[in-house]
Amino acid sequence: MRIAAAVLCGFFMDLCLGDPDWMPHPVIYMGKAISALEKFLRRKFPDTQKGLLMAGAALAAILPLGSFLIAAAVIYLAGLVHPVLAFLLETLWCWQALAVKGLYTESMRVKKKLEEQDLPGARSAVARIVGRDTQNLDAAGVAKAAIETVAENFSDGVAAPLFYLVIGGAPLGLCYKAINTMDSMVGYKNDRYLYFGRAAAKLDDVANYIPARISAFLMMFAALLTGQNAKHAFQIWKRDRYNHASPNSAQTESVAAGALDILLAGDAWYFGKLVKKPTIGENLRPVEAADIMRINRMMITASLIALVLFLAVRCVLCILL
């Protein structure tokens, strides 16, 4: 039951404390490892389509496996010193694998700037949590970007890490974070990463396939509990859940669009280039700053449901098996 207790404690530590700036975070070191491995692998493999695919596949194998093995070894060694030390370490990494408070804090900063009618400040705030160009977004565009980020990252930053933490503790949770970090750094379809980043992007799609779909239904239930349009959320999810280049990203975005009766996604600028993207949802009313609070209520409610559901399933399986 150590894993269940560590996940429970880690979740509420994240919910209350978020990620303090002074605390070293595993994702930072994963990012440094990705950069170093990319340089090394690009030197070792030929600069051809096949060579770049092989180099990217090597990265996609080394980083997640290495993250898992290092975490498992450190927890094991800590347990040899004292079981409490192993539990504290596992709790710490469970805490750091989750992003409930971070999502809430960053997105609500955007809401605050919009309510103050500080559009430049709102653009700067949303630029911290999205990959698109934000300098020309209007107020509705800024709010929409924040809503999309909270919806998508509920799966990537909360439900999926919880899913893997409950299955395999901190080692598997950090393995997932390594996959997710790789995708965010090299999983682009541009000249530099089209081939090198393909394995990382595909691995991220596989790792998120089940959690993303669970997340969609958790968000629907949360929409019902928070007074949003749960029926419309299901209808839009059923229609628009694949309106994205990723098979997973629109799963929760479509639920958010339906629950809030708004239109999300569509064309956006990335690195100075317009990227054509399908829309998600229906334009039943304008997007507003208050929708950021609404999606956060849904996200936090869905996070709590996920915690209870996943831990309950683990406990039942432990008893039966």
Task: Annotate each predicted stretch with a short phrase.
Residues 184:
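Glycine-rich phosphate/dinucleotide-binding loop and adjoining beta-alpha-beta core of small-molecule
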Residues 1-175, 179, 187-321:
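Hydrophobic alpha-helical transmembrane segments
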